[in-house]
Every structure is written in C-alpha cells, then in structure tokens.
C-alpha cells in the first residue's frame, strides 16, 4: 500500500499534496481556513446538486419550486438551509483567509495571490447569481440594481446590460442564464483551486514568523490533517447550528415574498458578505465613480504586495502595522454595517468616511508604517 501511494500516477499527486507534503512546524490555526474553504466548496457543490434536481429556472415557478423543496422533498429544508448558510460560512472563511494572508505576508507569493483574487471574484459572482435564483423580492431587485451598474460603462454600457438581461429588464431569460452560470461556476472554481494549490506547493507554505521555514518542517499527515479536522468540527458545529436553529438569521425577510417588478422594497441590499463593497459603491454620488470604487475595493488586493515596504514579511513583530491592520478590520465591519442601513444621514457621511479610510489605510498608511518600522529597526550608532 505504501508503494502504491508513492508510485501510482494519481495517488502520487495526492500523496505529494496532502500526505507527505512538508509544512512548517509553526503554522497556527489561521492556516486552517484553506482546508475549510475546500470543505465549504464540496458542501456547496453537493447540496447545490440536490437542489438543482428540484429547482425550476422559470419566473413563474422558481419561487414555488423553492417552497416545494422545503415542504415536499425529503430533507429538502435541510439541504436548502445548508446551502444558503454554507455560502455565509464560505465567505466568512474567505475573509479570514485573505486577512491572514495580509497579516502574515503570505500575499508575497504573487502567483498564488493572483489566482486567489481571481477565485474571490469568481466566488462573489457565483454567490450573486445564486442569490437571484429563489426569485424573491430581494433576489429580483438585487439583480436589477447590480446588473444595472453595467449601464454606467461608456458607449457599450446599456447594450451590455441588455445583453446580460436577455431583454430590456431582468426577466425569464435572466433567471435561466443565471441558473446556468450558478451551475457551471463552482466547477470553474474547483479548477482554479487546483491551480491555487499548484502555485502554493511550488513555494511551500508561509508561516507566522515570516522567515524561511526550510530548516524545520514536518509532514502534513498526521499533524496537520488532525489539526484541520478540529477546524472542520468547529465549522460544522457553526454551520449546523445556523441551519437547524436560525436558518433565516442572515437572510432578508423581503425574500419571503415572490418577485414583483411593480413593488420596490424600501431598502434594496445584497447578502451580508457584499455589504462592505455595497457601502463603498453607495458612498460615491456618481454611478460610474461608484462602480469603479466597487471594483477597486476588491482589485486593490492585487497591488498590496507592491505596497509592502517593510523589511520583515510578517506583521508579527511590527506593532504599528498591526494597529493599522486591526483598524482596517474594524473599518470593514463598519462598512458592512453601513451597507445594511438606509441611505440617510448620519449613515451617508459615516459610509463616505469609512470608504476614504479603507483606501487611505491600504494605499498610504500601511506602506508608510512599513517604512517607519524599517527606520526604527536601523542601528542608530
């Protein structure tokens, strides 16, 4: 069996990736989120597959088919709740994974980071088209508002929006194609995950101290498989608690009403994991400017490595950068809160200040902090 694991063409790849892989001996629980994201992806694909067996992507029957899944299909309510709350867990792990990368300097592995940002954008696209499928009020109006942002693009905007819609507004054609996108994108994500791992295993994992760990490495199995299993237990505990006790906690009450193009909800908002970007979009009183700020809020992750001015890789021994990082975290939480509030004072000005602070922290203050820390570490005699 040992020989087969090391000689079989397929088993050999799995062996080098998950069993005999050498990993730094000092990586903390913050390195669990990669494997948890893999588990989340598997859960989402499996639950999504069973939901797709009963769902109909037609404007007349979509809402009813979701109700049918919850009422008439064996454990349909559980599958639907796991899928809906699994998306929230997916994004929670994603945000923690990205935050870990920034804090410990893992983003300096540029190829891994680039694929990671593409993965983040693809997952966000998948979640957006998936949110439209139940065809509730917030599904319909969320799709209308977000796809309408394409019309802000000069010359081709309106044509592009109508091309995405398959008509002059969000309707049956839009729902059908969004279902097709939502079905195919997770498999594209799976392919990107494999590429992400391929690039990661070219360099090996970073570690919390940020120094080269080659002198002290241990095999992935059994040490990190057990550690990841503990993380998985916590993930399943939270996911099952959400799905079984408060399945609608993170949803929107408006989505219990079927889509009605003649009745606009008082406050249109996306799912909680998009609220920070939605707050940045709304903070600029110009359509094109808002769209550009929305894109910049995510794509800024691509330039973070070029803004890394510190001589040390990790923030573990950089107190000024640490402080700014946690201010950035608090700022993102503030933006998430603002995104869920109505467009009125004082929320407008708080959102604008938080948006300015978000970009200032990443583009100006954190690079300056790195330079300052370099200066403080230089011998002065």
Swiss-Prot record:
Q: How does it sit in the membrane?
A: Multi-pass membrane protein
Q: What additional remark is attached to this entry?
A: Heme 1 (or BL or b562) is low-potential and absorbs at about 562 nm, and heme 2 (or BH or b566) is high-potential and absorbs at about 566 nm.
Q: What is the lineage of its organism?
A: Eukaryota, Metazoa, Chordata, Craniata, Vertebrata
Q: Which UniProt keywords apply?
A: Electron transport, Heme, Iron, Membrane, Metal-binding, Mitochondrion, Mitochondrion inner membrane, Respiratory chain, Transmembrane, Transmembrane helix, Transport, Ubiquinone
**Residues holding heme b b566:** 97, 196
User: What Gene Ontology cellular-component terms does the record carry?
Assistant: mitochondrial inner membrane; respiratory chain complex III
Q: Give the top-rank taxon of the lineage listed in the UniProt record for this protein.
A: Eukaryota
Name the chain's protein: Cytochrome b
Q: Where does heme b b562 bind?
A: 83, 182
Q: Which InterPro entries match?
A: Cyt_b/b6_C, Cyt_b/b6_C_sf, Cyt_b/b6_N, Cytb/b6-like_sf, Cytochrome_b, Cytochrome_b_C_euk/bac, Cytochrome_b_N_euk/bac, Di-haem_cyt_TM
Comment on bound cofactor: Binds 2 heme b groups non-covalently.
For this chain's UniProt record, which GO biological process terms are given? mitochondrial electron transport, ubiquinol to cytochrome c
Membrane-crossing residue ranges in chain numbering:
33-53, 77-98, 113-133, 178-198, 226-246, 288-308, 320-340, 347-367
Q: Which cofactor does it need?
A: heme b
Q: Which Pfam families match?
A: Cytochrom_B_C, Cytochrome_B
Q: What is its main location?
A: mitochondrion
* UniProt-annotated location(s): Mitochondrion inner membrane
Q: Does the keyword Endoplasmic reticulum apply?
A: no
Any one GO molecular function term: metal ion binding
- Role, per record: Component of the ubiquinol-cytochrome c reductase complex (complex III or cytochrome b-c1 complex) that is part of the mitochondrial respiratory chain. The b-c1 complex mediates electron transfer from ubiquinol to cytochrome c. Contributes to the generation of a proton gradient across the mitochondrial membrane that is then used for ATP synthesis.
**What is the similarity comment for this entry?**
Belongs to the cytochrome b family.
Q: Which residues bind a ubiquinone?
A: 201
Q: How does it assemble?
A: The cytochrome bc1 complex contains 11 subunits: 3 respiratory subunits (MT-CYB, CYC1 and UQCRFS1), 2 core proteins (UQCRC1 and UQCRC2) and 6 low-molecular weight proteins (UQCRH/QCR6, UQCRB/QCR7, UQCRQ/QCR8, UQCR10/QCR9, UQCR11/QCR10 and a cleavage product of UQCRFS1). This cytochrome bc1 complex then forms a dimer.
């Amino acid at each position: 069996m040992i020989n087969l694991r090391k000689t079989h063409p397929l088993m050999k790849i799995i062996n080098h990736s998950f069993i005999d892989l050498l990993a730094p001996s000092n990586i903390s629980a913050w390195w669990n989120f990669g494997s948890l994201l893999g588990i989340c992806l598997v859960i989402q694909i499996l639950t999504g597959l069973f939901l797709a067996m009963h769902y109909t992507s037609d404007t007349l029957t979509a809402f009813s088919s979701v109700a049918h899944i919850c009422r008439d299909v064996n454990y349909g309510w559980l599958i639907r709740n796991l899928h809906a709350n699994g998306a929230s867990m997916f994004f929670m792990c994603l945000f923690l994974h990205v935050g870990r990368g920034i804090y410990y300097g893992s983003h300096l592995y540029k190829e891994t980071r680039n694929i990671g940002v593409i993965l983040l954008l693809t997952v966000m696209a998948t979640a957006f088209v998936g949110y439209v499928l139940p065809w509730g009020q917030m599904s319909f109006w969320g799709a209308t508002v977000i796809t309408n942002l394409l019309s802000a693009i000069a010359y081709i905007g309106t044509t592009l929006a109508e091309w995405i819609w398959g008509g002059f507004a969000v309707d049956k054609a839009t729902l059908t194609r969004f279902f097709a996108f939502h079905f195919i994108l997770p498999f594209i994500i799976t392919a990107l995950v494999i590429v992400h791992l391929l690039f990661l295993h070219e360099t090996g994992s970073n570690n919390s101290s940020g120094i080269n760990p080659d002198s002290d490495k241990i095999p992935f199995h059994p040490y990190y498989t057990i550690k990841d299993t503990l993380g998985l237990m916590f993930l399943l505990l939270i996911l099952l608690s959400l799905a079984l006790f408060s399945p609608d906690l993170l949803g929107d009450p408006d989505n219990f009403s079927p889509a009605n193009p003649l009745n606009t909800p008082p406050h249109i908002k996306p799912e909680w994991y998009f609220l920070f970007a939605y707050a940045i979009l709304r903070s600029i009183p110009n359509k094109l400017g808002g769209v550009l700020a929305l894109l910049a809020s995510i794509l800024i992750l691509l330039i973070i490595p070029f803004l890394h001015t510190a001589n040390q890789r990790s923030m573990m021994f950089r107190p000024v950068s640490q402080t700014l990082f946690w201010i950035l975290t608090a700022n993102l939480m503030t933006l998430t809160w603002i995104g869920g509030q109505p467009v009125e004072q004082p929320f407008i000005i708080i959102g604008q200040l938080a948006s300015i602070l978000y970009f200032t922290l990443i583009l100006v203050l954190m690079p300056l902090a790195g330079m300052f820390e370099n200066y403080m570490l230089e011998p002065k005699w």
